[in-house]
Every structure is written in structure tokens, then in C-alpha cells.
Amino acid sequence: MSENKQALQVAALKNGTVIDHIPSEKLFTVVQLLGVEQMKCNITIGFNLDSKKLGKKGIIKIADKFFCDEEINRISVVAPYVKLNIIRDYEVVEKKEVRMPDELHGIVKCANPKCITNNEPMPTLFHVIDKDNCIVKCHYCEKEQKREEITIL
């Protein structure tokens, strides 16, 4: 490991995942969506860090955790331009971008107060009908919602 990495304010990650370029205002929603509070590994969360692209950003470093695409793509609903760096032996071995999945299970609340998911104990299911603009449609009542209208469960 180089001297430069040892001098970082936050320790370099030996193995694990770095989730970067999270808009600061969405950081804690991303933490919730990933279930970070349930994890037993070392986790570092950086909030309001300087960013050339975003002005301010959030970052999450999770030691010894490697997400499957399904787990990580959930966050595309709130943070569509997040970057993932897969770290092994202090080196970035893979870079990924989140991708909007075709369906969202139990993540989004339906905006229709008469929808069965708001009146019965059942999980929500949305079909993504426009990935670029994040427009989703409820499987049960067919109510469409745009990203700015979405409420996360």
C-alpha cells in the first residue's frame, strides 16, 4: 500500500464496495434502501463531501461486502447516477453504474390512496415504464408516478 493511501482521512478499504457520487440529500435514503444498519461489517459514511460534479456528495464504504446487481439497482430510484467501485487488496478492480431495474418490489409507495397496497398488508410492485425519466406504474391500480412524486417505503 502506498504512503498516499495511508494518509487519507478515512482509511482506505482493503476489500469491499465504495458507493460514490451519491447526492448529499439522498445519502441517508440510500443507506436505508441498502439496509446498511443491518450489516455487521465496518461501514464508513461520508456526508457533504466536496465534489466537482455534484458540488456536495455522499459516499459509503462497506468493508468485505459485494452487492449483487439487484441489491444495488434499488437505489437508482433516488440516486440514478451513483458509481460503484469494487475494491480488492486496496485496488479498484471493477467500476459499475447503477441501472434502473424493470420492476421495483416493496420499495415505492403507491400514490393512489385507494390502491390495494395502501389498504391491505401486501408488498408493492411497480413496473418501470421509462428508465431515463424514472416513471413507474403500479402493478395493481396502474397509477403512474414520476421520480419527484415517488415516496420510498
Curated annotation (Swiss-Prot):
InterPro entries: Asp_carbamoyltransf_reg_N, Asp_carbamoylTrfase_reg, Asp_carbamoyltrfase_reg_C, Asp_carbatrfase_reg_C_sf, Asp_carbatrfase_reg_N_sf
Disulfide bonding pattern of the chain: none
Cofactor(s) of this protein: Zn(2+)
UniProt keywords, alphabetically: Metal-binding, Pyrimidine biosynthesis, Zinc
GO molecular function terms attached to this record: metal ion binding
GO cellular-component term (any): aspartate carbamoyltransferase complex
GO biological process, one term: 'de novo' pyrimidine nucleobase biosynthetic process
Cited PANTHER family: ASPARTATE CARBAMOYLTRANSFERASE REGULATORY CHAIN (PTHR35805:SF1)
Protein's UniProt name: Aspartate carbamoyltransferase regulatory chain
Organism: Bacteroides thetaiotaomicron (strain ATCC 29148 / DSM 2079 / JCM 5827 / CCUG 10774 / NCTC 10582 / VPI-5482 / E50)
